[in-house]
Amino acid sequence: MTAFIPLLRPAAVLLALASAASAALADSRAMPADSMLPAYRQECAACHMAYPPGMLPAASWKRMLSGLDSHYGSDASLDPALVRQIGTWLEAHASTYKRVREQPPQDRITRSVWFERKHHELNAAVWQRTAVGSRANCMACHTHADRGDFDDDRVRIPK
């Protein structure tokens, strides 16, 4: 039995490292705010939170940028060169892992499978509260969302 102990220690270390790496990848939708493309932050956060690009697959971002003249009921048109710059950055940082690979209906983060799974326990009335406003207002409950931090331990649901 003691002959296996030296082999178990490296295996345990590798298992712990793999587990930590897996946990980090599991929440890789988040992106620190200071690593966002300044043009993306400036243009998109002028109207709503600059959502981390990992919340949608590249195809969704591409479609969204191709229809900025009718962006969820608003004209968010930008200079074509700026659209290309933002698009290149969004596509490079878009989600590609299994959890967000599928394209949500109408390219809405709030209609994605992962979003529904993470928020399924919330009563529909929560979304109607004045302090929340809508499912797209991440900052209402995720108080550090503007920093790319969606940790469940920091969620505060307004009353």
Report each predicted region and the residues it spans:
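N-terminal secretory signal peptides that target proteins for export/translocation
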Residues: M1-L7
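Bacterial N-terminal signal peptides
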Residues: R9-S22
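Sequence context surrounding c-type heme c attachment/ligation sites in exported
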Residues: A26-T88, A92-K159
